[in-house]
Regions:
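Non-transmembrane, aqueous-exposed alpha-helical and coiled segments at domain scale
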Residues: 1-423
Length: 423
């Protein structure tokens, strides 16, 4: 399993793509098209949003699981783009139980974010939150509903009526035409019908057959709905437990859980970010690493690595190994810092606080490391990394209490140093 250990954009797609070479099945378990990830292979970048990263491998079954919320139009566009790039998506399976994102979800998302003004969350405005809200309210529409025209028509009619009332009366924006939406989505349903199946059944079948199954998380631990920096979080549970629920498997089947950690920290949108660098160092890292959102294009906030936050994330998902990414971005720096904990009024704070006002009053405690002046992007063996780079990586392991499994030194599949083989 691959889980983001920070605030997202850690490079999960690259790690999943690498591990998928030896996987028979890759399962996406939560989130929606708000989760952008990029796979680089053969010098070509493939930005993905709903597709599991294993789609690059023609013999790997790729499953969009029960916990995912699916924008059908976005998924079809992504499939067509991949086809145009020579990638065959015929190995895709879509869960009958997954919920569908509709245009009214997107418009509600946009309208509510605008209404919040200065209190905005920083949502991607892809309708993810409103779709999950319908799921919780038990009025959501699932993929299996779309496969039955009469069932779908009845459920859609109810939802369009309710959502139009909200949009027009509360937000003062235009609603939607039910007949047109029905026609559009029945068309999408027919295009996707060949890929739809009971993935709860197929996942267990593959496991029972002894297949190598890789579970791919979206977003990241610090954006978890319950345990992240609420309300500046996502609408699902991007932790190991959430993956179990979203993929419909029990926790004892999860082995080799990788926490993906960028060698520095980034965050998109609003919310607390204790180690943020609003200075030349932060700007330099952003430009070297091109830290702009895959989905939104927004510049990411940049900071030093927060080992306290990663240790908290490790506790949420019981990481077996860390996958350190973008270590090469730090090439040439004189000094590099890691946040090892927090203080308030000179006293150490042991927990990661829920109270965001309190969190913002904390002072990060840093440990400073010597940088390295060598270009490490061509290194393939851990022992060949510069001494200072190894010292930095090993400090991350020590401070988080999790051993190193993978070190990534570049965006491509080949730029990967494997410390621990899992397949």
């Amino acid at each position: 399993m691959v889980i983001g250990a920070q605030w997202g954009d850690e490079g999960k797609g690259k790690i999943v793509d690498y591990l998928a070479a030896k996987a028979d099945v890759v399962v996406r378990s939560q989130g929606g098209n708000n989760a952008g990830h990029t796979v680089v292979t053969g010098g070509k970048a493939y930005p993905l949003r709903l597709m599991p990263s294993g789609i690059m491998y023609p013999d790997t079954v790729c499953i969009v699981g029960t916990g995912v919320v699916i924008d059908l139009k976005s998924l079809l566009e992504e499939m067509n783009t991949l086809k145009a790039q020579g990638v065959d998506p015929s190995n895709l399976q879509i869960s009958t139980r997954a919920h569908v994102v509709f245009p009214y979800h997107i418009r509600l998302d946009e309208a509510e974010e605008a209404r919040k003004g200065n209190r905005k969350i920083g949502t991607t405005k892809n309708g993810i939150g409103p779709c999950y809200a319908d799921k919780i309210n038990r009025i959501g529409i699932r993929i299996c509903d779309l496969m039955d025209k009469d069932v779908f028509a009845e459920k859609l009619k109810y939802n369009v009526e309710v959502k139009n009332m909200l949009l027009e009366r509360l937000y003062g924006v235009e609603g939607f035409d039910y007949e047109q939406m029905l026609k559009d989505y029945l068309g999408y349903a027919e295009q996707l019908r060949p890929y739809v199946c009971d993935t709860n059944h197929t996942v267990h079948k593959y496991i029972e057959e002894g297949k190598n199954v890789l579970f791919e998380g979206a977003q990241a631990s610090m954006l978890d709905l319950d345990n992240g920096t609420y309300p500046y979080v996502t609408s699902s549970h991007p932790v190991a437990g959430g993956a179990c629920v979203g993929a419909a498997i029990g926790p004892h089947l999860m082995q080799n859980i990788f926490g993906v950690v960028k060698a520095y920290s980034t965050r998109v949108g609003e919310g607390p970010f204790p180690t943020e660098l609003n200075n030349e160092i932060g700007n330099t890292i952003r430009e070297i690493a091109h830290e702009y959102g895959t989905v939104t294009g927004r510049p990411r906030r940049v900071g030093w690595l927060d080992a306290r936050a990663v240790r908290y994330a490790a506790g949420l998902s019981s990481f077996d190994y860390l996958a350190i990414t973008r270590l090469d971005v730090l090439d040439g720096m004189d000094e590099i810092k890691i946040c090892v904990g927090y203080e308030k009024d000179g006293q150490p704070v042991e927990e990661y606080p829920a109270d965001l006002k309190y969190l913002e009053q904390l002072t990060p405690v840093y440990r400073t490391f010597k940088g390295w002046k060598q270009n490490i992007s061509g290194i393939r063996k851990y022992e060949e990394l510069p001494e200072n780079a190894r010292a930095y990586v090993e400090a991350i392991s020590e401070l988080t209490g999790v051993p190193i499994g993978i070190v990534s030194v570049g965006p491509s599949r080949e730029q990967t140093i494997v410390v621990k083989e899992v397949f």
